[in-house]
Amino acid sequence: MKKLTTIALLFTMIGSMFLLSACGEEEEDLSSKIEEKVIAYQTDLEDSASTLTSTEAIRDYLSNWAKSKGIKYSVDSHNNVIMSVNASKEYKEADPTVIVCSYDAKQFNNNIEPMAMALYIAKNNESTGKLDVIFTSEVGHDYAGIKSLDQKYFKDNSNVFCLNGGEKNMWSTSTGARSSYTFSNNVAYTAPTGEKAYKIKISGLPGGIPDSKISSYPNPIKELGDLLAYFKTNALIYELADITGGSSGNLYPKSSSMTIVIDEDDIDKFESRMETAMENFNDNYLEDYPEMTYTYEEVPLPEKVVTEEYQNEFVSMLYTLLDGVYYKDDDDNLISITSIGAIHSKDGSYTISAVGNSLSESNMSEIDTTYKTICGLSDIRYKKYDEQLGFSSDMESEFAKAVAAAFNKYSDADMEYKDCVPATNASYVYEKNKKSNIINVSVNEDKMERYTGTIITFMMDQTHTEVAD
């Protein structure tokens, strides 16, 4: 009898070993599958980036991709692409999952990782519950697509993951509020008195959404404004012909340029000041932004320059405007940021566009007031043309706990929810249905595979039954 018991125990141990081995292989297979395929989607998006330079081109790319994969899709009147996957028999009772991911031709490279995640989930959801993967259109991060999206996609029991690119990888149940501004003034022109004109340009920066890297991002518009102030304090007389940069107030500018006129007797002084400015700038930023260039070159003399009175007011205002970290709390946590995103001239008027993001309502109000005050002192027209409420949900909710559990199960690590200072699409989803479960996901390529695996694991862990063959 003892011998039989020993043999039975041996078979039990062997069976357990096979079971554990099978589970380990299953998890490893899922991880390997995700890593291989999500990187493939990322690579294809990167390789296609040179052709995806308009809303229509990206919309068609997504539509054709869904069609080629046999995924049901639709496109609404605002160029939102909605891919839909029905629940499998096993997951008929599972709550629906919604993936929301924006695309924007003005900052396409910053959307690639979340788009790759969303494409993977649409095609490889492991036969789980009802799934909608929604790609919302944007132009200069204006949220146009999500604002116009039909609320029918967000049910009371929907589990919504808002995917966004970011400097930091994190899961958030709170995201910041946003205000978008323009500051405009008319300028007068006169004929130049100097004999030499130079174009100064900073370019090759990645752009993107203002976020936690703002203190280390070299804003080219602000840098050129500071350069003009530097010239003034170092007794270099110049005349400003034009200055331009950026494509949207809601984004970091990728480049900026200006043309100034100087007296030919000041050429040596000008070149000396420029060499110093360029050397300091490159020392500070070139290592982190190797594609960036800072140049100047002689150009034909312009027919007109801004008058001295308007030039002084304009340069003073540009130098004074908020740009960068606005507030950190006592624990050095980032709370509020501001960014100058664009500057352009038209019909004798200059317009500067900027944005503020904050987790604090009082800070957001202070930023509004500060910008308004600066404009008032310089006789500049101030306008807050758009605003967005922050989003906050309970990090102790059953949904948040389930996502954290899926993260732990997939990666064998603990998740910590962190507040996201930049405003995100999560607040617009919340406006459409306050009963939906919503989490914001900020991701770059470092955690793309792990975060994809977390969402897939969460979906696999939803209510389901085994269906007999």
Model-predicted segments: where are they?
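Acidic/histidine-rich catalytic neighborhood of metal-dependent amide-processing enzymes
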Residues: 106-193, 209-211, 328-332, 339, ...
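Alpha-helical metal-binding/catalytic segments enriched in His/Glu/Asp
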Residues: 98-145, 181-183, 199-204, 211-231, ...
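Zn-dependent metallopeptidase/amidohydrolase metal-coordination segment
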Residues: 24-30, 329, 335-355, 401-465
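Acidic/His- and Gly-rich active-site-bordering loop/insert found
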Residues: 30-109
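C-terminal motif of bacterial Sec signal peptides marking the signal peptidase cleavage site
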Residues: 18-22
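Acidic-enriched catalytic cores of C-N bond-cleaving enzymes acting on peptides and small amides
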Residues: 191-195, 212-244, 250-251, 259-337
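Active-site-adjacent substrate-binding region
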Residues: 212-246, 377, 385, 392-433
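His/Asp/Glu-rich mid-to-C-terminal helical/loop segments that flank catalytic regions of hydrolases
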Residues: 131, 216-234, 267, 310-328, ...
